[in-house]
């Protein structure tokens, strides 16, 4: 039984066969002063329907669960009158328990009109030894839709509005025993529940709830609930409720199309009192045949907590995902920025999007969709008190573009990550591949647009490959784009910021069939006079890691290609200030393999810190750039080639880069081990001011080494070639404009080449192999990372 004045459900037998035998079937004649414009028949349990005064009906409830079928009163044309007109009141009352439940089935009129409630609904417990208090769970079902008018008020223990039917037994099981409530709509129904502006819904007992379930849900009124809300758009829906937490699954999506969920009112309630008093707002929709969207505006969330350490409540918005308590797609809102939503549990492939704008959220918020999740400050500005988690498989974005502000007091996660499936019972191998989307934070377009984040930030478009674990087949991983950009706007972050677009091979060992992995784009940039102020550390990562191929059984390569990690001020200028260290990485590590040919390639990308126009990058700590390429180990042949990428900081047409501590740039190439060592080729690493000023407070180090791999497997193999690349610490200038590079400590640039170790002798017929050749960077040779530049060392 759902206890509205307790935080834990009681599992006691309620309305059994003996109680059913006492059920009353009362169908009073329509009276002129009757409040409800319908004739009611009690079809389950025991209750009595009376008109106690003019326009006031009272339903006295004698059993824990009651079901009443209502036949609407019609006009001469077959149209239903308002079920509860303005000024009329329906009172549901029990003198035996505050935990009674009443399901009101409003049957269709001749013309199938929407059922309209404009009056007042009250449910209460009349304690003979105490005052009357709100209590009871009241449900209204109408298959043709429900309209809650602007004059309607509800003062209840708990409330459900639905266009989906249920059985008497299922309703009793939910109400009395905390079981599953199975709700089923007519196939293809698009019936809507609309709650108009001005409508007031109040449920004050602790552990209350308010549920709205239909093909189309439009919540435009106000609901203040001392517990949890659930707004669900679907055709078949399962609900269970315990300790303030809903489990919500939608086996069949809504037949409605377009915007099927709108919360554009005041949705909230008092704060949780602490452990066991869970306050949640849920909104779910599942698509069926046609694309759908969900819109959230105005006010969401609960009152501030009265004591430190208490979470006042949480908000979960979900498109094409079921929800279990606080968990969606394998991740929990309570885990904040560390949550991982990688269970591949989307319930539909049909597009379902979420849009949040012009809103105030007074609790932590998670919005997750199978496709696009977008949050914008809108023309009115927006705010979140708590953490903000935005997850969209194709796109997740957070922005302010209308000259208004967007503030978040806690941490922010913006994720378009993708996870390949790992399974031994696959129907389609495509699902083991991962292709991430686009994740972004953006402020700009209109001057005055701003974003202020009080905690840490993670913007992620990583791709995590899956695998067929029966046949040991690896999936591919293609990272997306992750960015934090201020363009004519202002972004302030009080904590650390991580921008990640990595390509990660499967972690399943002993892979036999490898696949390619690629890093994407990680961008932290200002342009058009935009500004970014980051108090903590910055981490940009577009690394790529190949899968772990078997070294004992035959296995194919998993080539890895690093992406682009960019810290930059772009056209139109701007400024970036980082209070801690800055780290950018676009390294690549080829996967292991066992084949007679070459091993996996490790081809690094670009890790750069540039100003392309007049502007400023100021880093209080150190700056580290890494674009190392490591070839994969190959037990059956030649080790993989390792290709260093570009790790550089540059000024092109002016501007200033200040680094308070040390500067380190690495673009090394490391050949993989094999029966013959793989070759390693250095890339391009360093710092250069063509025009402008670079100041490094500590030491500066640039390395573009080429290191050959060793002949580790078998006997007598030769080591791999090691060829150095291009390393530089330079200031050029022109006849008209100056350039300076100032280093406060040691300055080192290295483009060494070191051959790999030869294989060992078997002590008998096979002699030890020779070491690989090593060549330092040579100016006569174009660099493999960018043939427009020759190799060598330049200071």
PLM segments and residue spans:
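Extracellular and secretory-pathway beta-repeat/beta-biased strand scaffolds
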Residues: 2-795
């Amino acid at each position: 039984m759902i206890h509205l004045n307790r935080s834990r459900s009681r599992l006691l037998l309620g309305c059994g066969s003996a109680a059913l035998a006492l059920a009353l079937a009362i169908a009073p004649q329509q009276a002129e002063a009757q409040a409800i414009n319908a004739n009611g028949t009690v079809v389950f349990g025991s209750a009595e329907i009376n008109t106690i005064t003019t326009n006031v009906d009272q339903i006295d409830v004698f059993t824990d669960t009651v079901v009443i079928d209502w036949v609407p009163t019609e006009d001469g044309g077959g149209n239903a009158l308002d079920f509860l007109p303005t000024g009329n009141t329906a009172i549901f009352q029990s003198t035996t328990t505050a935990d009674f439940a009443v399901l009101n089935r409003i049957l269709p009129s001749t013309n199938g009109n929407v059922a309209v409630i404009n009056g007042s609904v009250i449910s209460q417990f009349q304690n003979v030894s105490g005052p009357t208090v709100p209590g009871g769970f009241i449900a209204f079902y109408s298959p043709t839709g429900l309209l809650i008018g602007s004059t309607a008020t509800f003062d209840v223990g708990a409330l459900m509005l639905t266009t989906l039917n249920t059985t008497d037994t299922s309703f009793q099981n939910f109400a009395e025993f905390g079981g599953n409530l199975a709700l089923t709509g007519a196939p293809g129904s698009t019936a809507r529940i609309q709650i108009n502006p001005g409508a007031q819904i109040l449920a004050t007992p602790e552990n209350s709830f308010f549920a709205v379930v239909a093909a189309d849900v439009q919540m435009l009124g106000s609901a203040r609930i001392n517990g949890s809300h659930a707004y669900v758009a679907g055709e078949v829906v399962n609900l269970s409720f315990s300790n303030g937490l809903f489990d919500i699954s939608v086996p069949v999506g809504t037949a409605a199309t377009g915007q099927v969920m709108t919360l554009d009112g005041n949705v909230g309630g008092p704060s949780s009192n602490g452990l066991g008093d869970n306050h949640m707002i849920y909104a779910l929709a599942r698509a069926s045949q046609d694309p759908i969207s969900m819109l959230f505006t105005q006010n969401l969330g609960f009152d501030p907590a009265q004591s430190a350490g208490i979470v006042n409540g949480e908000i979960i918005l979900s498109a094409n995902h079921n929800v279990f308590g606080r968990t969606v797609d394998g991740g929990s809102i309570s885990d904040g920025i560390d949550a991982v939503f990688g269970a591949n549990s989307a319930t539909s492939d049909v597009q379902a999007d979420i849009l949040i704008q012009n809103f105030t959220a007074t609790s932590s918020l998670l919005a997750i969709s199978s496709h696009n999740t977008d949050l914008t400050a809108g023309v009115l500005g927006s705010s979140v008190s708590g953490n903000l988690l935005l997850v969209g498989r194709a796109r997740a974005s957070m922005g302010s573009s209308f000259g208004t502000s967007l503030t978040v007091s806690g941490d922010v996660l913006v994720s378009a990550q993708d996870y390949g499936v790992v399974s031994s019972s696959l129907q389609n191998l495509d699902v083991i591949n991962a292709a991430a989307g686009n994740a972004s934070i953006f402020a700009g377009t209109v001057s005055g647009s701003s974003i202020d984040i009080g905690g840490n930030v993670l913007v992620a478009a990583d791709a995590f490959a899956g695998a067929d674990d029966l046949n040991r087949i690896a999936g591919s991983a293609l990272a997306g784009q992750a960015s934090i950009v201020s363009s004519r706007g202002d972004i302030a972050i009080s904590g650390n910021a991580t921008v990640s677009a990595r390509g990660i091979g499967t972690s399943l060992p002993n892979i036999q069939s490898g696949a390619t992995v690629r890093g994407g784009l990680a961008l932290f940039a200002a342009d058009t006079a935009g500004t970014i102020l980051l108090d903590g550390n910055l981490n940009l990562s577009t690394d790529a890691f190949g899968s772990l191929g078997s070294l004992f059984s035959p296995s194919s390569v998993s080539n890895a290609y690093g992406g682009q990690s960019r810290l930059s001020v772009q056209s139109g200028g701007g400024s970036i200030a980082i209070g801690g260290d800055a780290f950018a990485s676009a390294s690549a590590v080829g996967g292991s393999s066992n084949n007679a040919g070459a091993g996996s390639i490790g081809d690094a990308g670009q890790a750069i810190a540039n100003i392309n126009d007049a502007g400023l990058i100021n880093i209080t700590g150190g700056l580290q750039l890494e674009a190392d390429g490591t070839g994969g180990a190959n037990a059956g042949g030649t080790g993989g080639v390792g290709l260093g990428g570009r790790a550089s900081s540059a000024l092109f047409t002016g501007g200033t880069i200040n680094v308070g501590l040390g500067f380190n740039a690495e673009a090394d190439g490391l050949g993989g081990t094999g029966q013959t060592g793989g070759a390693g080729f250095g890339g391009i690493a360093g710092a250069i001011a063509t025009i402008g000023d670079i100041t490094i407070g500590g030491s500066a180090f640039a390395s573009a080494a080429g290191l050959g791999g060793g002949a580790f497997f078998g006997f007598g193999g030769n080591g791999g070639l090691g060829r150095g690349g291009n390393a530089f610490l330079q200031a050029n200038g022109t006849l008209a404009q100056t350039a300076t590079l100032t280093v406060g400590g040691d300055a080192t640039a290295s483009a060494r080449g070191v051959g790999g170790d030869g294989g060992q002798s078997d002590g008998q017929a096979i002699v030890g192999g020779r070491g690989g050749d090593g060549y330092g960077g040579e100016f006569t040779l174009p660099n493999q990372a960018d043939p427009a530049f020759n190799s060598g060392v330049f200071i």
